[in-house]
Amino acid sequence: MQLEFLGTGAGSPSKQRNVASVALRLLEERNAIWLFDVGEATQHQILNTTIRPRKIEKIFITHLHGDHIFGLPGLLSSRSFQGGTEPLTIYGPVGIKRYVQTSLQVSESRLSYPLHFVEITDDGELFNDHGFRVIARKLDHKIACFGYRIEEADHPGELQVEKLREQKVPSGPIYGQLKAGKTVTLPDGRVLDGHDFIGTPQPGRIIAILGDTRQTKNAILLAQNADVLVHESTFAKDETKMAHNYYHSTSKQAAEIAKKAGVKKLLLNHISARYTGKAAYQLAYQVRNIIPDTRVVNDFDVIDIPFKK
């Protein structure tokens, strides 16, 4: 599981940063890519990665400001042109369906795959297939805006092979049955419960990806005990008033949310073009006294999300 940042800038593209988009790479987990926001030129950014558009299974839009959606029609068309046939689902605020359908109709674009929409009106669960669960909550922005919490299901514990060998259990199909938690009767009459030979389950990973927002309780709820929080940092830590007026956050406010939520790693994105070079990295440096594992992400950064130790 990895996060790959395709655009980390705020408002409009700059030479250093494209506008908002981040890919959650779930190739090992479900052979799929999930995108969060699709700013202008996202498909061009993808050309500089190993992402294949036909692998994109779901797209989650935080809100309908242009820097988060202007790349969507082009990406959808290219996915079709490149041979995509698998269904794709777009989640987002009310209006996302009309925006996409109008863009495709006016441009007379035809897609080679089924396109589904889930328009969000309130907080709640969007998706749950027992492998992953996605929850959306409203944030505090100028227009309807949502954050997303992605929860991976716990992984079953490992089969304790040494314990089986100690009890002289013959290897073979029996091991598979025990690993599945089944009760097995051996040729010598012994009855074994598979649960007695399975280790502690591996907790699933949790990621929170937020859209543009002021500080809000829902941000804490979304990020509660997350392994990674992706939070906007449009303004530096001392620009609290400006952040409030523009419905955005400072780096310090993002770190405070992470601290209250018990987050392990904070990734700051949605960086204003006013912060370049060292000034951008200062956004993270200034708040590491709150969350030590904080970094400002750049376009094309890839962040591994390991299992909890």
Curated annotation (Swiss-Prot):
Positions contributing to Zn(2+) 1 binding: H63, H65, H141, D212
Family matches, as InterPro entries: Metallo-B-lactamas, RibonucZ/Hydroxyglut_hydro, RNase_Z/BN
Keywords, alphabetical: Endonuclease, Hydrolase, Metal-binding, Nuclease, tRNA processing, Zinc
Cofactors that this protein relies on: Zn(2+)
Residues bound to Zn(2+) 2: D67, H68, D212, H270
Entries under Gene3D superfamilies matching the protein: Ribonuclease Z/Hydroxyacylglutathione hydrolase-like (3.60.15.10)
GO MF: 3'-tRNA processing endoribonuclease activity; zinc ion binding
Reactions that this protein is recorded to catalyse: Endonucleolytic cleavage of RNA, removing extra 3' nucleotides from tRNA precursor, generating 3' termini of tRNAs. A 3'-hydroxy group is left at the tRNA terminus and a 5'-phosphoryl group is left at the trailer molecule
Cofactor note text: Binds 2 Zn(2+) ions.
Top-level taxon in the UniProt lineage: Bacteria
Protein function: Zinc phosphodiesterase, which displays some tRNA 3'-processing endonuclease activity. Probably involved in tRNA maturation, by removing a 3'-trailer from precursor tRNA.
NCBIfam families named in the record: PRK00055.1-3, RNase_Z
Family indicated by similarity: Belongs to the RNase Z family.
Subunit structure as annotated in this protein's UniProt entry: Homodimer.
Protein name, per record: Ribonuclease Z
Organism field: Limosilactobacillus reuteri (strain DSM 20016) (Lactobacillus reuteri)
